[in-house]
Design a protein with these regions (language model features):
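Short acidic/polar alpha-helix capping motifs at helix-coil junctions
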Residues: 14-18, 69-70, 84-85, 96-99
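A conserved, well-ordered hydrophobic junction motif at loop->secondary-structure transitions
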Residues: 43-79
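HotDog/MaoC-like acyl-thioester-processing domains
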Residues: 1-15, 102, 109-156
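Short, solvent-exposed coil/turn segments
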Residues: 28, 98-100, 130
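Hydrophobic beta-strand-centered segment that forms part of the acyl-chain substrate-binding groove
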Residues: 75-118
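Hydrophobic residues in beta-strands and at strand termini
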Residues: 46-48, 107, 153
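Non-catalytic linker/capping segments at the edges of enzyme domains
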Residues: 1-56
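A generic structural signal for short beta-strands and their flanking turns/coil linkers
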Residues: 16, 31, 40-42, 61, ...
Length: 156
């Protein structure tokens, strides 16, 4: 799905920091999740294939958690860029990379297979190198999981 409001955050990570299985553009075997800044929130989409099955017809929770993980670190990087007045459409790379210190996931409803999942992120707060982001993962109009991440901006 295309968004015209920003480049994907993960496509702006420097090459040497872009091998993450969940979101690295340089990991051809990975999920290559793409997080976009749209207004004051972040959006990503992912369509799981059937190898990620938990019970037949539903998606494995570990995948749900890893999507929230990578959307969370990407969202954190985007919100730091906003705070630092970095326009994501005017740069080739961003000088910001965040890693997960803590991730909380609440599974609210079974995540159905065969539906494009939508992830949304909202900034909760930034305090120095610590960024908290609240997230949802939805299928159609149902919130299947919520997440809260504490991401840490890695040192220069
Ligand atoms: C450098 C290579 C980068 C590669 C990028 C690829 C990332 C791909 C995305 C991921 O999937 S990340 C994978 C899962 N995460 C990890 O493997 C991270 C493992 N943990 C660490 O490497 C370090 O603990 C971490 C970088 C997160 C923090 O270490 P630092 O030495 O940079 O910072 P520090 O320990 O001083 O913590 C900074 C602040 O965060 C707080 N903090 C850290 N971990 C916390 C935690 N778990 N819960 C609550 N607070 C936490 C800590 O108390 C402190 O607060 P204050 O500044 O107020 O004192």
């Amino acid at each position: 799905m295309m968004h015209n409001k920003s480049k994907a955050i993960q496509d702006l990570y420097p090459d040497e920091l872009a091998h993450c299985y969940g979101c690295g553009k340089n990991n051809l075997d990975g999920y290559q999740l793409k997080t976009y800044l749209v207004g004051d929130e972040t959006i990503a989409h992912f369509l799981p294939d059937e190898k990620f099955t938990a019970l037949p017809g539903s998606v494995y929770g570990g995948l749900v958690a890893s999507l929230l993980d990578c959307h969370g670190t990407g969202s954190a990087a985007a919100f730091v860029c906003v705070q630092e007045n970095i326009n994501l459409n005017e740069v080739e790379t961003i000088p910001v990379r965040c890693v997960t210190a803590s991730l909380k996931v609440d599974f609210k409803a079974p995540t159905p297979m065969g539906v494009e999942l939508k992830l949304r992120g909202k900034l909760q707060s930034i305090e120095g190198r610590k960024i908290w982001v609240d997230m949802t993962l939805s299928a159609d109009d149902t919130i299947c999981a919520t997440g809260e991440i504490l991401a840490i901006k890695i040192k220069d």
